[in-house]
Regions:
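N-terminal amphipathic, basic helical "cap/leader" segment at the start of enzyme domains
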Residues: 15-113, 209
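Short, electropositive alpha-helical surface patch
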Residues: 170-180
């Protein structure tokens, strides 16, 4: 009887532990928001925190284990170089009649406000899997990063301006690699916003027979 009681106690403890883990994960998922650079404060993100956020990306699902995510970490003086490069690309690619000085200036402002910027790159393996699967895998990897950042109280958001199509040389990308966005990060003072979501029941169909 004592042995059975012990087994029941262990099972109950395991259930409570698993329930707690699920609740913690659900809270992190539901609290995650895009936090923009204007809310960032000038506080350094330690290297080990950056590495922890990146490491979480490495456990995203990936068909045939191609692990297509490739990241370029940009910080310190590198941020100004990125801002200047984005400004240069904008100036060279936008028609003169559509050029906006405010838009041009915003690239340098955003990169300077962020503490760290991670270029999100994809390495394609067309001989192994379709490109869309690699894109989906990297999307999962970035979600892991966003959730880990939320858990560590680091603000983050994934920016994908059209200019990223021209960042290959700046980032030193190979022919089978492409930039799919910039992941801005920084400690912040933004207030928690309510999630703007319609009911999940409106987006699900069940087939049971």
């Amino acid at each position: 009887i004592l042995q059975m009681l012990n087994i029941n106690a262990v099972c109950k403890m395991l259930f409570l532990k698993m329930s707690s883990k699920a609740e913690i994960l659900s809270t992190i998922i539901k609290n995650r928001r895009s936090i923009f650079p204007e809310s960032y404060i000038q506080q350094e993100i330690p290297t080990n925190i950056i590495e922890q956020i990146l490491e979480s990306a490495n456990y995203a699902p990936t068909h045939k284990l191609t692990q297509p995510w490739r990241f370029t970490v940009i910080r310190k003086e590198g941020k100004a170089k990125l801002g200047a490069e984005l400004g240069r690309i904008y100036k060279e690619t936008v028609p003169a009649e559509k050029f906006l000085q405010k838009k041009y200036d915003s690239f340098g402002q955003k990169t300077s406000q962020a503490e760290v910027i991670v270029a999100i790159n994809i390495q394609f393996h067309e001989d192994k899997v379709p490109n869309w699967e690699e894109i989906a895998a990297v999307g999962c990897a970035v979600q892991n990063m966003a959730l880990t950042a939320e858990a560590l109280n680091v603000g983050a958001y994934w920016s994908s301006p059209p200019l990223i199509d021209h960042l290959g040389d700046f980032l030193g990308l190979a022919e089978n690699e492409k930039c799919y966005g910039l992941f801005y990060m920084g400690y912040h003072n933004a207030e928690q916003r309510e999630a703007n979501r319609t009911p999940m029941a409106d987006k699900v169909k069940w087939i049971e027979g």
